[in-house]
Amino acid sequence: MDYAPIIIGDQVNIAPKVEIYTASPHSITDHRLVARPITTIKDNVWIGCNVCILRGVTIGHNTIIGAGSVVTHDIPANVIAVGNPAHILCKLN
């Protein structure tokens, strides 16, 4: 498996059963990924129960990820994101 780093900022709240995937369990061992994308969760983020975060995404500052969401791409700062795939529900002031 190829593993990649995770960066978690300050004041990040992670609820139970959150999964953060950084590995690529590709069965063809001769074709490993050269780039190991970093998964980044910035400061003041709240991640609800049963959220799945895929490798290489960035979740911006002051963001809420709703329970059961699947984060497949970057989520900007100051938003609430929900769903599968996660999308912006609203912006926070």
Label the predicted regions.
Residues M1-T58, N84, L92-N93:
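Flexible, glycine/small-residue-enriched loop-and-beta-strand segment within the central core
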Residues P16, A67, A77:
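Residues that flank catalytic or metal-binding motifs in active/ligand-binding sites
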Residues Y21-T22, G66, T72-H73, L89-K91:
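Conserved acidic donor-binding loop of glycosyltransferase catalytic domains
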Residues W46, I64, I80-V82:
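Short-chain dehydrogenase/reductase
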Residues C49-H73:
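Beta-rich strand-turn-strand
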Residues I75, I80-N93:
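C-terminal end-helix/capping segment
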